[in-house]
Amino acid sequence: IIVTNQDHEANTGSWRRLESEGFVIREWKVNTDTGSLIKNDLESLLDENVLLVTFPHCSNILGEINPVGDICRLIRKAGAFSCVDGVSYAPHGFSDLSLLGADIYLFSSYKTYGPHLGIMYICSELNQLLPNQGHYFNGDSETKKFTPAGPDHAQIASVAGIVDYFEALYKHQFSEHKELNRIAPLAAEYDYQKGLEYRKKKDKESQKNA
């Protein structure tokens, strides 16, 4: 399994812990000068033994948006599956899964101003390979087999409120507060640079303590 050091703990910790079960974990490290994940570095890690590559659509640390489509095609060509954490991207852009080509894509609806629910897309090919985690009579259902206790119907119904929120947000952003819209990108760039400085500092500390 290949993980990155650009990920949130949610999409790296659980995979890293599988090392205690005998899995080999490889780390795809960011370029410390840019904060980017470089495809050539991934290519050097991929071989016939790799089953899964996990990485973020957007780093919650630096805000770096990765070229998911290109990366997923590279992973698929190597014969592995991809798992993309979309939680930091989902509030800021539309994830077109038909273009991204991810085998697994996950995010949390509370990050898009909805209820505290996890949302997962999984391709049919991989779905068929995984065991049923729900009731035995749902074993053949691609959508129910991964919900052990059944869906939370009240939470699911409240997802509709996300649309109401975005309609109000659109009105607020594009009808009013033009000066704030001008300043926001400048603040985002400042935050990115501060995050990059922090990442470099942690890498230096890690190398010093190695």
Language model segments and positions:
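Pyridoxal 5′-phosphate
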Residues: 2-210
